[in-house]
UniProtKB/Swiss-Prot annotation:
The keyword Transcription applies. Keywords: Activator, Transcription, Transcription regulation. Isoform 1 is not glycosylated. InterPro entries: US22-like. This is Protein U17/U16. Pfam families: US22 (PF02393). Belongs to the herpesviridae US22 family.
Amino acid sequence: MADERTGDSVKTRYDIALMNLNDIKIAVFRDSLSTYVEQKTGLTIQFNWPKSRCLVISTLCKIPFPTKSAAELQEMCSLLLCCPERLQLLGYVSVWGEETRDVCLTKTLVFAGEDEKFYGLDFVNETLYLLAETTERFAVLGLRRYDPVYREKDIRFLTKIDDVLQSLIDAQDNLWKFATIVYKNSGRHYIMKSCLENNDGVFVLFLTRKEDFPSRMEWNFFSDVYESMPYHGQVIGSIGKTLLYPKTMFVMMDLSGAIYGIDTIGTGIGSCVKIADDFESFLRQGIVRGYRRYKFFHRNISTVQEILPLCPHTSLGPTFSNNYNYDLSSEDDE
C-alpha cells in the first residue's frame, strides 16, 4: 500500500480531483450540471487537504441530512452573497472512507458558482465560504478556507505550541485575560510554516506592542496606524518575514474571540479580513485568508467581509490601549 505521505500519492490525488473538477467545469459551461450530478451521484472526490474529508457528488434528494428546497437554498445563498450569482448544487462534504462516507460531521453543501468559483455552505450556521476561485485552485486548496475543518484535532498546528501559546489558547474566550498574557510576553515571535502560500515561504506571528517596534524609519507609519486603530478589540500581533522587516498585516482579536487581519500596505488602514473563528484555529490555518486573497461571507449582511469591506469594528473605541495599566501583580492561572 502506498504511503499517503509520498509525493506520488499527493500528485495522484490532485490529478484525480482536477480531472473530476474539470468534468464539472465542462458541465457548468454546457449548462448541464444537473444532468452530471444525477449521473455521478455517489462519486467521491478526495483532496490533498485534509485527507480525512471528501466531496460527495449528490442530488438534493439524496443528501444524508435535512436541508431545504432548491429554491430556498438559492435564496439563502443569495442573501449570504454580497452580489447576485447563480449557484448550482454539487453535493456535500463528508468523511473519507467507504464505511463512513455518509457521516457528515459538518452539514456542508458544496455549490458551483459562476466563472469556475466553488462555495461551501455551512447549513447549520448559515455561513457561506468561497472555497476557490478556479477549478485548479480548488483541486489544490481543498477545504483550507473552510473554518469548521480547523476545529478538528487531527489538523496540525503550523508552529510549535509552547507554554505561552497554550496559555493564549486557554484564554481565547476571555479577551481581557488574553490581552494581559500578550502584554506580558510582548516581543516573542513564532515562525508559522505556510502550507499554502509560497511567496514568502514562512510567516512570522509577533506578540507585539507599539512600544516594542524597532526604531527604524520604516516603522514610523506602522506606529501611527497602531496608535489610531479604530477597531473594537485587541491587536495581538503582526505578521511579516522577519523581526526587522516592516509588517504587512496586524492581527486583531475582537470581543467574540474571532481573529482578523488588518492590511497595513499603502497609505492608510486597509482591509479587515476575518482569518479564523478563534486563536486556536488561527494557529492551525495561518493566514490563508490574508492579503486580499479571500472573501468571507457572514449571515449578517452588515458585517460582510470582502476585498473592500465596511469593517464591523470601525467607529468603536479600542478595548485596550497602549497606556492601559495592566495588573501584573499576580501570576496567570496555570
